[in-house]
Curated annotation (Swiss-Prot):
Its cofactor is Mg(2+). The lineage of its organism: Bacteria, Pseudomonadati, Pseudomonadota, Gammaproteobacteria, Oceanospirillales. This is Oxaloacetate decarboxylase. It comes from the Bacteria. It comes from Marinomonas sp. (strain MWYL1). InterPro entries: ICL/PEPM (IPR039556), Oxaloacetate_deCOase_bac (IPR023687), Pyrv/PenolPyrv_kinase-like_dom (IPR015813), Pyrv_kinase-like_dom_sf (IPR040442). Its EC number is 4.1.1.112. CDD domains: ICL_PEPM. Substrate binds at residues 50, 159, 235. Catalyzes the decarboxylation of oxaloacetate into pyruvate. Seems to play a role in maintaining cellular concentrations of bicarbonate and pyruvate. Mg(2+) binds at residue 88. Keywords: Decarboxylase, Lyase, Magnesium, Metal-binding. One of its GO terms (biological process) is propionate catabolic process, 2-methylcitrate cycle. The keyword Coiled coil does not apply.
Length: 287
């Protein structure tokens, strides 16, 4: 089966946004996972920033991965993907000018869409890891992203954290981002349908949710009715791969089965703990 062109996959993603339906993403962290996801019928995949950091660096989601490293992984996937790939481009790897560079590089990598978030990254001294930048700065970064895009079919999605804001603040932000001309709004931290409905009535473009398999947000028809077109429910496939690797190697060494689950294994074998210590010691960052 021939691999579709980047332009075709971007058009496919646009069709998903315009379909009136809600789709779940596959966690596509390397070329094989992307091809498996397409063969199993997934309509869209996502390369998560946290997953890329673990896969490339064995590092936690502390904005340690560089644009070049992330783009290299996206390029490997984009070279053979048979479904549209969303790239979690974090904060665009810096200020508005860095965002422009991010757009250029990820567009060349072949992604169908990418998200740019308003989190203050990398975390600053004395700040929380979930702090957000001022809305004016975020608007400037989104305008820069749209300016840098060459293929107008590639979708640019603005992301914010509704769990760190009041409902009124969230509405104010998404309205400001929508006015810039982005192709969608991505939100993390939506608690339930009441929370979603209060915000979604102010959004006239497609919505993407990072829901982490929230049991309060599992009614796909109701999600679609509220404008939600894409839902990210975590990266179970990636963590299952970690667990499978551990179990295979453990059995080859004749070691008895342990009690660690996939999440605990990723913590044990990543550099999470030392980075937490360093962040608290040198930057006074609070999670």
């Amino acid at each position: 089966m021939a691999t579709p062109s980047q332009h075709d996959l971007r058009n496919d993603f646009r069709a998903l946004l315009a379909s009136g339906k809600c789709y779940y993403t596959a966690s596509t962290f390397d070329p094989m996972s992307a091809r498996i996801a397409a063969d199993l019928g997934f309509e869209v995949g996502i390369l998560g920033g946290s997953v890329a950091s673990l896969q490339v660096l064995a590092a936690p989601d502390f904005a340690l991965i560089t644009l070049s490293e992330f783009t290299e992984q996206a390029t490997r996937i984009g070279r053979v993907a048979r479904l549209p790939i969303i790239a979690d481009a974090d904060h665009g790897y810096g200020n508005a000018l860095n965002v422009m560079r991010t757009i250029v590089e990820l567009e060349r990598a072949g992604v169908a869409a990418l998200t740019i978030e308003d989190t203050l990254l990398p975390a600053k001294y004395g700040h929380k890891s979930t702090d957000l930048i001022p809305v004016e700065e975020a608007v400037g970064k989104l305008k820069a992203a749209l300016e840098a895009r060459i293929d107008p079919i590639m979708s640019i999605i603005a992301r914010t954290n509704a769990g760190q804001l009041s409902t009124e603040e969230t509405i104010s932000r998404v309205k400001a981002y929508q006015a810039v001309g982005v192709d969608g709004i991505c939100m993390v931290g939506i608690r339930d349908f009441a929370h979603l409905e209060e915000i979604s009535q102010h959004i006239s473009i497609p919505i993407m949710l990072v829901a982490y398999d929230n049991p309060e947000l599992r009614d796909r028809e109701r999600l679609a009715a509220n404008g939600v077109r894409i839902v990210v429910n975590g990266h179970a496939a990636y963590f299952a791969a970690i667990k499978a690797t551990y179990d295979c190697l453990r059995e080859q060494r004749g070691i008895a089965e342990g009690t660690l689950d996939a999440s605990e294994l990723s913590t044990r074998y990543s550099t999470l703990e030392e980075n937490r210590v360093w962040a608290n010691k040198y930057m006074d960052v609070q999670e």
